[in-house]
């Protein structure tokens, strides 16, 4: 996996996934 995402972008994506779960 190539980390072409920034740490902040990863956190935003994770938050979106959590919102989908809810």
UniProtKB/Swiss-Prot annotation:
Disulfide bonds: none
Main location: secreted
Region (Disordered): 1-22
Signal peptide: none
GO cellular component, one term: extracellular region
GO BP terms: smooth muscle contraction
Molecular function GO labels: hormone activity
Keywords carried by this UniProt record: Hormone, Secreted
Biased composition (Basic and acidic residues): 12-22
Location in or out of the cell: Secreted
InterPro entries assigned to the protein according to its UniProt record, in alphabetical order: Motilin_ghrelin
Regions of compositional bias (Polar residues) in chain numbering: 1-11
Family designation: Belongs to the motilin family.
Function: Plays an important role in the regulation of interdigestive gastrointestinal motility and indirectly causes rhythmic contraction of duodenal and colonic smooth muscle.
This protein's name: Motilin
